[in-house]
Swiss-Prot record:
PANTHER family: DNA DAMAGE-INDUCIBLE TRANSCRIPT 4-LIKE PROTEIN, DNA-DAMAGE-INDUCIBLE TRANSCRIPT 4 PROTEIN DDIT4. Keywords: Cytoplasm. Belongs to the DDIT4 family. InterPro entries: RTP801-like, RTP801-like_C_sf. The gene is DDIT4L. It holds the Pfam family RTP801_C. It is found in: Cytoplasm. Inhibits cell growth by regulating the TOR signaling pathway upstream of the TSC1-TSC2 complex and downstream of AKT1. It comes from the Eukaryota. The keyword Cytoplasm applies. This is DNA damage-inducible transcript 4-like protein. GO terms for biological process: negative regulation of signal transduction. GO terms for cellular component: cytoplasm.
Length: 193
């Protein structure tokens, strides 16, 4: 459907009739306010909420690594690249933004890949009062540094032979695998970062 005016044709007389009534081609843009063209500012409450949620995810991941270093990894220290947990938390928030329950419907399985073998570290349920709608599998990767193997070799021969003296260095790369639990076709998204 097309809206039409009272003009019956587009002849020069009709155009002059428009101009006589005060229509000027440039005036159409002047009728709109400049701010109508600007992208709206994000809601400050949403930004604060997202930042708070991101920080709590960072803490959950750091606690998971801290808990696992003695129990599952058998090392005394885990060195994490700067802002790695921050990047992971932002990606988790991005992947959960399209889900029906958002982050609340997420169950995250945290693993560590060491020499092509995945070791399970923890299972994080974001909100136990919500039925999970998707799973995220986070795979940390060990840094492949030759100097750490040398250091471990030399320190294991002397008084530092305790298994808990070992330092694990994480790579800045990680993998996130998203699996929708409610989808009939079983949509899986794999992101390598």
């Amino acid at each position: 459907m097309v809206a039409t005016g009272s003009l019956s044709s587009k002849n020069p007389a009709s155009i002059s009739e428009l101009l006589d009534h005060g229509f000027y081609p440039g005036s159409l843009l002047n009728d709109f306010d400049y701010w109508d063209y600007v992208v709206p500012e994000p809601n400050l409450n949403e930004v604060v909420f997202e930042e708070t949620t991101c920080q709590s995810l960072v803490k959950m991941l750091e606690n998971c690594l801290s808990k696992s270093k003695h129990t599952k990894l058998g090392c005394s220290r885990v060195l994490v690249p700067e802002k790695l947990t921050q990047r992971i938390a932002q990606d988790v928030l991005r992947l959960s933004s399209t889900e029906p329950c958002g982050l609340r419907g997420c169950v995250m399985h945290v693993n560590l890949e060491i020499e092509n073998v995945c070791k399970k570290l923890d299972r994080i349920v974001c909100d136990s009062s919500v039925v999970p709608t998707f799973e995220l599998t986070l795979v940390f990767k060990q840094e492949n540094c030759s100097w750490t193997s040398f250091r471990d070799f030399f320190f294991s021969r002397g008084r530092f032979s305790s298994g808990l003296r070992r330092t694990l260095i994480l790579s800045s790369g990680f993998r996130l695998v998203k699996k929708k639990l409610y989808s009939l076709i079983g949509t899986t998204v794999i992101e390598e970062c």
